Amino acid sequence: MENEPNTAQTSLPGALSEASRGSDELLKMAYAKLKDSSLDAALSLLEQALDHDFDNDEIKHALKCVHWWIEHTRRIDDLRNPYEKGAFLISQFKQYFVFLGQLNNAYEQCQYAIRFFVYSKALYFFEGLLSNPANQHDPGLLLLVGRCFKGLGNFDEALKYLEEALRIKREDAELLAEVADVNALLSQTKTAKALFREAFFIDPQKIDLRFMESALILKLRDIVSELGYRNEELLEWIPVYGYLQGVFSVKRELKQVEAGRLKQSIFLI
């Protein structure tokens, strides 16, 4: 008698492939809903995707991230002022970065969708405020609007708002770093180097590297981090190693206090 074919074994790979295709499609749909600011719809699709493919680490990661944002944005409806709503959304990134640091991986597609969700929703709140001429000269609002456009990949529009904010609030390290970052993203490397140098010499502690996106500054951050520096100490050493590595190579005359600080730091290496 001939052996009957093992139908379980022959059908299993096809079934797994079909399930994987189904979960991949649901994951893409979830990311699309996330970009449309539909957190609940994204959550529902991710739960369906997990039913299709329970071992998919990216789906599990995305579920954790969406749950986090649902939990941490509940109180936004209690805020009445559009500026407060938008600023609150962006402020949550600092806690979110800590949360992400506790996870094994940070899947880029997921994080792109999260950033798109936050910045597009925040920008929705801010844009209504910009119709008021008085708000068009508020450097705090202009900074947040510029940061939103940068996060959404519209670098030219980001630069317009950030440069306007910098004209109002000169020698602000946070603003200078943002303008430098956008210039680097626009391949204006010489300008970016000069502005980053300026920002870090003015006040490195005001610069949040977690909001920086350009390879120019992130590579320098990684170099200093690999030397064992962390947190506030890392920020203080970035201008020193930026000078030594030639990243801050665009020349300008250092103020006396800046030159003294730089020499002292180099002697300590």
For each feature predicted by the language model, list its residue ranges.
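Short, charge-rich amphipathic alpha-helical segments embedded
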Residues: 39-75, 167-175
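Eukaryotic alpha-helical solenoid repeat scaffolds
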Residues: 99, 103, 110-134, 138-142, ...
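Boundary/linker segments of alpha-helical solenoid repeat arrays
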Residues: 54-61, 91, 171-178, 201-215
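Residue-level signature for tetratricopeptide repeat
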Residues: 32-33, 49, 66, 112, ...
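Start-of-helix register in tetratricopeptide repeats
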Residues: 24-25, 58, 140-142, 147, ...
